[in-house]
């Protein structure tokens, strides 16, 4: 059962998982990016040593994929969004590798020592071939599985767009060791910049982004990136007591599915360039404050039919 009751063996197990992943360094992944840049979608190294990169699963050495999945689990355990008793019973120290797909992009920001400071993924639905979004045989995206819906029943897709032109934003998370406000904002912007570069590099072009967000938390990141967001109201998560991530939906404020259609194929590159300029500003907070107003981001709401 997904309870996270304190003081039991699963609590101690979760602490061990967090400790294990806290000591990992991905410094050699930076070396790999410098030695073999063609397999990386994005690489940016700032003057202070902060590094952000994007790499698809198919080019990520297995040991680093395990490490990334471990980072994801460790942060969610600390936030109380992963079920420690499920992790304990299944004896897992990272999120299951099987939930990733070959074309998923992993965007990572690291400290000069190689410690992960922030992470977000750009996920496919895992279909080997492109399908119509209303094809009953197509694989569901994770947000659709969690909420028990076809998200495009609630927000109409762009004409002609198929599964290979849709990506899901997942696991936008900062390291729990990151407490400085300026550094946290910096990492957020670096991840959004890397995400924009990954979207811009995708083939075929990404036309729609989906996922789910807390309205007063991650939604702000989407608006900061200049996205126009349509939220789906009135869904109910379908996760069971045996699901590792049930608490991601029960221990947070309402988590709502969203759809964001990109206006054209060049939009992501344009927004990435704007974020890169923001990151070069001497006053990061002021520059970030000016982003949403300048980009006319907005939120629309779609009520799920009963």
Located regions from the model:
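Acyl-donor binding region in acyl/amide transferases
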Residues: 132-252
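Short amphipathic alpha-helix that is part of the acyltransferase structural core
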Residues: 2-7, 23-32, 38-93, 106-116, ...
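A contiguous, low-structure linker/loop signature
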Residues: 117-141
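Charge-patterned, long linear interaction tracts outside catalytic cores
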Residues: 293-306
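Secondary-structure boundary/capping micro-motif
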Residues: 1-19
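A short helix-loop-beta-strand connector motif used in the catalytic cores of GNAT acetyltransferases and
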Residues: 96-108, 128-131
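Accessory, usually C-terminal, subdomains that scaffold auxiliary metal cofactors
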Residues: 216-295
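Extracellular structured ligand-interaction cores
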Residues: 102-104, 117-119, 164-166, 206
